[in-house]
Amino acid sequence: QGSKVIVMVTDLRESGKPKCERYFPENGEGVEYGSIHVETTQVTSYGGYQQRILAVKLAEEEVYDNDDGTEQNDEQTEEEPEVRYITHLQCKRWPDHGVPKSTSAIFRLYYKMLEYRPRDCEAPILV
């Protein structure tokens, strides 16, 4: 879909219990989901939310040994895979129950979301 922004409006835990599965890697780590490699390259904490930069690319091809001891890739190419950068914004101040007492944190997150999505972009924002 070409999305450039993901907005997460919940925390991973609520009242000490798991609320949402972590679907993004820790800062500096990478995870493979099938043929897709996702790496969190940066995390910045703001007042009521966190911003992560996710680098997304095709996973490296598997290398295996031939019968003669040489290595072979499934796909012989020297090109580096294209990397797409996605901004992940996570609201950290939404209470476990009810609504926030102040709307300032959610509005800051909203304006940051707009900052990372160009006006001429037709790709959806994932929430």
Curated annotation (Swiss-Prot):
**Acidic residues composition bias: residue spans:** 63-81
Boundaries of each Tyrosine-protein phosphatase domain copy?
Answer: 1-127
A single Pfam family, by name? Y_phosphatase
The EC number(s) attached to this protein equal: 3.1.3.48
Record carries keyword Nucleus: no
Keywords attached to this entry: Hydrolase, Protein phosphatase
- PROSITE patterns given in the database record: TYR_PHOSPHATASE_PTP
Q: Where is this region: Disordered?
A: 63-82
User: What's an example of a GO molecular-function annotation for this chain?
Assistant: protein tyrosine phosphatase activity
Question: Hydrolase as a keyword?
Answer: yes
- Reactions accelerated catalytically: O-phospho-L-tyrosyl-[protein] + H2O = L-tyrosyl-[protein] + phosphate
Q: Which family does it belong to?
A: Belongs to the protein-tyrosine phosphatase family.
This chain belongs to the protein called Tyrosine-protein phosphatase 2
Encoding gene (name)? STY-2
